[in-house]
Amino acid sequence: MKSFKIRSAALAALLPLAAIATPAVAHDHAAPKAATLYAPITQAEVEAAQQAWGNALVAISTEYDTKGFAAAKTLAGQVLDGAYGYGMGPVLFKPTLTVAPQTFRTSRDGALAYFVGGDKAFPNDSGFALKGWRKFQIDNAGIVITGNSAISMGNVTLWDAKGNMTKVDKTWAWTRGADGNLKIVLHHSSLPYSAK
């Protein structure tokens, strides 16, 4: 796995302004929050966030299998609120198995529908997180860190309770939230291309 730290002004300009801005602190009591918000992200934090995402997906599947849809939906909502940046604004989310006109899910409701289904506004969603996932593996092709923003790209391999395997190409981008934790602000997932 390759990790890159970018210092180039050209690439930094492509990332959120918050990643390169230095906050002006007007009052001493604001300093701890601002310092946390703008603290540089580390590779260990990115890898921990990826593991937390995989563990959450398995937990939602297990919750569905053991306690039913309502419990899985509640847990999925908690995961979205904790791991994704929907509370900060739109998230650029392109799930693996979506079709036009609902390919992109910039709202929390759209993401929740993708993960657990059951939303009439998203009739093609059957609940990706409800597919019996029991194990996962993340293999990064690379991680790019610029200040308080990070991007990773690689593969996520998932196994269900029967041992069936699904591999997806995955790109995530994070920024640090006001609580100091990483928040997913971009999530792109697709099935690997297979030349015929």
State where each predicted segment sits.
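Bacterial N-terminal signal peptides that target proteins for export
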Residues: 2-11
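Bacterial N-terminal signal peptides
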Residues: 10-20
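Juxtamembrane cytosolic interface motif at the C-terminal end of transmembrane helices
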Residues: 21-25
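Short, low-complexity N-terminal intrinsically disordered segments enriched in polar/charged residues
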Residues: 26-83, 90
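A solvent-exposed, acidic/Ser-Thr-rich amphipathic alpha-helical stretch
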Residues: 67-140
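Short beta-strand edge/turn micro-motifs at domain boundaries
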Residues: 145-153, 157, 161-195
